[in-house]
UniProtKB/Swiss-Prot annotation:
This is Extracellular metalloprotease AFUB_008060. SUPFAM superfamilies: Metalloproteases ('zincins'), catalytic domain (SSF55486). Belongs to the peptidase M43B family. GO terms for biological process: proteolysis. It is an enzyme of class 3 (hydrolase). It comes from Aspergillus fumigatus (strain CBS 144.89 / FGSC A1163 / CEA10) (Neosartorya fumigata). CDD domains: ZnMc_pappalysin_like. It comes from the Eukaryota. GO terms for cellular component: extracellular region. Keywords: Disulfide bond, Glycoprotein, Hydrolase, Metal-binding, Metalloprotease, Protease, Secreted, Signal, Virulence, Zinc. Disulfide bonds join C272-C299. The keyword Disulfide bond applies.
Length: 322
C-alpha cells in the first residue's frame, strides 16, 4: 500500500489529467514542465509539412534568395505586469539583459527585435494570470506581426475553464511546479495561426503573444531558470517552432517537430544532463542544448540550422504584413 503522501500525490495527478484534453505527464518537481498540454492543430501541421517540402527543393531564383537572406526586424513590446508586493521585482537592467539575450539567441537567423516600448502595470489579477483576455485586450500593441511579451510576476496555471479553452485553441505552454506552493507557470505562447490574414480583425488575434514568468528574466530569483531562457523558448513558439520532443514518441510514424536536423526525441530534458538519448534506435543524441527542449537555462545554447530557416519561412508565410 502506498504511503498517505504518495496517495495524495497520485490523486493530484489523476485530477490534473481529468482536466486536460491533451497529454499531461508528471516529471521531477524541479523540472521545467509538470504538465505539457495543447499542441498544433491540423492546419498548422499542414503548414509545417508545406514548408518542409518547400525548404527541401532547389532554390528557384532571386525571391528565394531574398527570403533566405533578408534581415527580419520584428516590432516588439514588453509588458511588465506586477503584483503590489512585487512591484520592484523587474528592474530596468533585467529588461535590458533580456532583450540582449533575445537578440543574441536569434541573430544566426538574421532575426532582430526592435523594442518599441516597455509598459509597467501593477494589477494583482493580471500578475497571476487571473484574466488573460482582459489584460491582453488592454495592453496589446501593434498588428499580428508585432510581438507582445507579458512578463508576469506571479504567473499561475489557468483555471479549469481557461485551461480547456486554451488547449482547444492549440496554444503551447509548460507549467513549472517547484517545492514552493502554489505552482507557477514558466510560460506559454501562441503559435502562428494560418487563418489570420492582413484583413483579419484585431479581435481574431487579441490573445496572440507570449506570457512569461517574470522571475525567469536574467537576474530573477528562479534558480536554474533565471537567465532569460524561458522567453527565448516561448518566442520560438511564436515564430512557429514546436518542441524537439513533439509527439513524445520514437515511432517512425511520429513527425515530431517537422525539422529535419533535430534528432528524434521522446521525452523532455530535465535539468542539464551530460547527454541523453531517449530514442536510441534513431540517429543522434537528444539535442539537450536546444532552446525548444525543456532543459534548464544553463543548458540552453542554440537552435539548429533548419530551425533557423523554418522560423524565417514561418515569418514570411504567417506573420509578415499582417
Amino acid at each position: 500500500m502506498l504511503p498517505f503522501n504518495s496517495c495524495v500525490y497520485v490523486l493530484l495527478i489523476i485530477s490534473l489529467m481529468s482536466n486536460c484534453r491533451a497529454l499531461c505527464r508528471a516529471t521531477a518537481l524541479q523540472g521545467r514542465s509538470l504538465c505539457a498540454t495543447g499542441g498544433p492543430d491540423a492546419a498548422f501541421r499542414a503548414e509545417h509539412e508545406r514548408l518542409s517540402a518547400f525548404e527541401s527543393r532547389p532554390s528557384s531564383g532571386s525571391y528565394d534568395m531574398r527570403r533566405a537572406l533578408d534581415p527580419i526586424e520584428i516590432e516588439t513590446w514588453f509588458h511588465i505586469v506586477s503584483g503590489e508586493t512585487d512591484a520592484d521585482l523587474v528592474t530596468d537592467e533585467m529588461v535590458i539583459l533580456q532583450l540582449h539575450y533575445l537578440q543574441k539567441a536569434y541573430e544566426k537567423a538574421s532575426i532582430s527585435y526592435r523594442l518599441k516600448g516597455v509598459t509597467r502595470h501593477i494589477n494583482e489579477t493580471w500578475a497571476r494570470n487571473g484574466d488573460d483576455s482582459a489584460m491582453k485586450k488592454a495592453l496589446r500593441r501593434g498588428g499580428y506581426s508585432t510581438l507582445n511579451v507579458y512578463f508576469q510576476t506571479n504567473l499561475q496555471p489557468p483555471s479549469t475553464t481557461d485551461f480547456a479553452r486554451w488547449t482547444s485553441d492549440g496554444d503551447n505552454r509548460h507549467a513549472y511546479n517547484s517545492d514552493l506552493a502554489p505552482p507557477s507557470v514558466l510560460g506559454f505562447c501562441t503559435l502562428p495561426d494560418p487563418s489570420i490574414n492582413s484583413s483579419s480583425p484585431r479581435s481574431s488575434y487579441s490573445k496572440d503573444g507570449c506570457n512569461v514568468l517574470a522571475k525567469t528574466m536574467p537576474g530573477g530569483p528562479m534558480t536554474h531558470y533565471n537567465r532569460g531562457g524561458t522567453a527565448i523558448h516561448e518566442i520560438g513558439h511564436w515564430n512557429g517552432l514546436l518542441h524537439t520532443f513533439e509527439g513524445e514518441s520514437c515511432s517512425e510514424d511520429n513527425a515530431g517537430d517537422y525539422i529535419a536536423d533535430t534528432p528524434q526525441q521522446s521525452v523532455p530534458t530535465d535539468g542539464c544532463p551530460s547527454q541523453k538519448d531517449s530514442c536510441p534506435d534513431s540517429p543522434g543524441l537528444d539535442d539537450i542544448h536546444n532552446f525548444m527542449d525543456y532543459s534548464s537555462d544553463d543548458c540552453y545554447a542554440s537552435f539548429t540550422s533548419n530551425q533557423l530557416k523554418r522560423m524565417r519561412d514561418m515569418w514570411f508565410s504567417m506573420r509578415k504584413g499582417k
